[in-house]
Amino acid sequence: MNDYTLALRRERRLLMLLGWVCIALLAGALYLQYVKNEDPCPLCIIQRYFFCAIGIFAFVAAGIRNWRGVWVLELLIAIAAAGGVGTAARHLSIQMNPGFSCGFDTLQPIVDSLPPAQWFPGMFKVAGLCETVYPPIFGILLPGWALIGFAVILVAVVASLWRHRRKLAS
């Protein structure tokens, strides 16, 4: 095996791990929704969409056997993670500043009209308000955990893109 193949194999393992982490985070969100009765708000649902996109892109990239395809999908992962960072930061700012709203009246019908909300309503239907603060986990609010998750994913994928940028030339 040459260095090219070994590096691609390591990258594919990282992408599989990333995909499984997204599945675990989504499973945790469903646990909080159905066991702890913490209803998701529009921004929560948007964050779920970003985690789903990251997971799908990661699993597809893990199945690709050339660097160019992996690079394109990692770029899409980075874009989704950046969108997730922005959404989670907005959600966190709403929860830390009482009296602010996520615009439930305008956001809720848009989020609920997306096709996945019709196909999987238990996962993607809005049922709560963004300003509702649920008990923190280890002292961090739920949007804070999402922000940490998106930021770690973004840093890991951007570092990977930077580290392997020369492989695209070959």
From Swiss-Prot:
Keyword Transport: yes
GO cellular component labels: plasma membrane
Topology in membrane: Multi-pass membrane protein
Molecular-function GO terms, alphabetical: electron transfer activity; protein-disulfide reductase activity
Example GO BP: protein folding
Transmembrane segments: 15-31, 50-64, 72-89, 145-163
Residue numbers on the Periplasmic membrane side: 32-49, 90-144
Subcellular location: Cell inner membrane
Keywords of this entry: Cell inner membrane, Cell membrane, Chaperone, Disulfide bond, Electron transport, Membrane, Oxidoreductase, Redox-active center, Transmembrane, Transmembrane helix, Transport
Cystine bridges: 41-44, 102-130
Cytoplasmic side: 1-14, 65-71, 164-170
Function: Required for disulfide bond formation in some periplasmic proteins. Acts by oxidizing the DsbA protein. Required for the production of extracellular protease.
Family listed: Belongs to the DsbB family.
Name of this chain's protein: Disulfide bond formation protein B
Organism: Burkholderia cepacia
